[in-house]
Structures are given as C-alpha cells and as structure tokens.
C-alpha cells in the first residue's frame, strides 16, 4: 500500500523560498518510490523578495503559498488544512525560505521562533511518532519542534551548528552523500545544498533521506 507524504514548501527560490532543486528531487524520489504526495505551505507574506539574478532585495511582496504553487504545479494547500492523521510522514526541503518564512532563524538565530501554523503541523508529526525528513537549513528548526537532545545535521557549518546546539539540538557533522537519523524520534536529516556543489550531489543525500523516511513508515506496518 502506497504511503501518503506531506511536503512543506516555503516559497520558490533558494534565497527567499524553497530550494527548487531540493524540492523537485524530493518530489521525484517520492514519486519513483510510489508514494502519494500532498504539498503544503503557509498562507503568509514572504519575509522579502530577492532578485535571484543579482542577489538584491526587490521592493515588492509575495505570498509563500502562491509562490510555492509554482513548484507544486498548483497542487498545493494551505498548511492550516493539513491533518497529521491523513499522512504517514512529513518532509521539508530547504532553501532560505525555511529560515525566513517557516521560521525567523535567518534573523534571530538561536532565539528564533517557528511560524505558528508550521510549528503546529510539525509538532503534530513529532507527537504522533511519525517519520520526518529535514534537509539543508530546515534541521535548524528541529530543536523547536522536538525539544532538547534531538540529533540532526546541516552538514558541517560551525556557526549554524553552534546555533542549533544552543537551542538544545545535538548537531552531528555529515557528508553531503549521507544522512543523520535520530532513531528515537524518527527524524532523518541530510545537508543537501548546505554542502552540495551540484544537483547530483544534493540528490545523493536527499534520495537516501527520502528512502529512509519511507522505510520508517513501513516499520509501523509490522
């Protein structure tokens, strides 16, 4: 029986939303493995809009749900409509949107908070003991979701790892091709573009993470 996976997107574009390569690799791997997928995003304004050609901020406003719909080809719902009981697992691609829209980690660091609708859903998965996959900068939110002692990775960036540890997480350095698993919490993380120098490098770890998340959903079948 195919598993149902929720995917949270944070906009469209690495500098102000979801990392597009990471999101597409995730959706492709889930489809290749026969999973049913539903994308969600918060219906809120982005922190800001970045010109991805120049890296400069643009004087306009964009909506996270509307922008995320670009990646999901329109098949996306407001995160407030998500019910943990409808899904077997959750995956959150990275990109600065995770640190700017799903949370304010990019601004506040260790003193960050998670957007309330995002926190409600991710905490529901944690409390239900359902598998969760986080990649790139998204694991920076793990301590806010799971509490102290959660084991995860963003690769090997010392400053980010220090902020995560300050929040109560236990950061484990990890190669781009590998994953870190907190077995007690069924949380799987991988560095993706925190380390990847190419789309294929990013895919190596993301595919491994997706595969492991799906394996964990089948453990509940036993």
Language model feature labels by segment:
Residues 59-75, 80-85:
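Glycine/small-residue-rich loop that forms an oxyanion/phosphate-binding "nest" at active or ligand-binding sites
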Residues 1-3:
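A short, charged/proline- and glycine-enriched loop
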Residues 6-20, 24-38, 75-222:
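Active-site-adjacent pocket-lining segments in enzyme domains
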Residues 40-65:
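N-terminal beta-loop-helix "entrance" segment that forms/cooperates
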């Amino acid at each position: 029986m195919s598993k149902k996976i929720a995917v949270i997107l944070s906009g469209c574009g690495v500098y102000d939303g979801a990392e597009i390569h990471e999101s597409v690799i995730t959706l492709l791997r889930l489809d290749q493995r026969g999973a049913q997928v539903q994308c969600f995003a918060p219906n809120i304004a982005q922190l800001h809009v970045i010109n991805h050609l120049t890296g400069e901020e643009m004087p306009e406003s964009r909506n996270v749900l509307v922008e995320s719909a670009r990646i999901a080809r329109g098949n996306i719902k407001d995160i407030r409509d998500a019910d943990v009981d409808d899904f077997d697992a959750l995956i959150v691609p990275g990109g600065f949107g995770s640190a700017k829209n799903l949370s304010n980690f990019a601004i506040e660091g260790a003193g960050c908070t998670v957007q309330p609708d995002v926190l409600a859903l991710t905490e529901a998965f944690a409390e239900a003991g359902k598998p969760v996959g986080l990649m790139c900068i998204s694991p920076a939110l793990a301590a806010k979701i799971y509490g102290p002692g959660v084991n995860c990775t963003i690769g090997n960036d010392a400053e980010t790892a220090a902020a995560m540890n300050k929040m109560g997480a236990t950061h484990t350095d990890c190669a781009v091709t590998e994953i870190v698993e907190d077995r007690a919490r069924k949380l799987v993380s991988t560095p993706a573009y925190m380390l990847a120098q190419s789309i294929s490098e990013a895919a190596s770890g993301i595919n491994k993470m997706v595969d492991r998340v799906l394996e964990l959903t089948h453990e509940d079948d036993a």
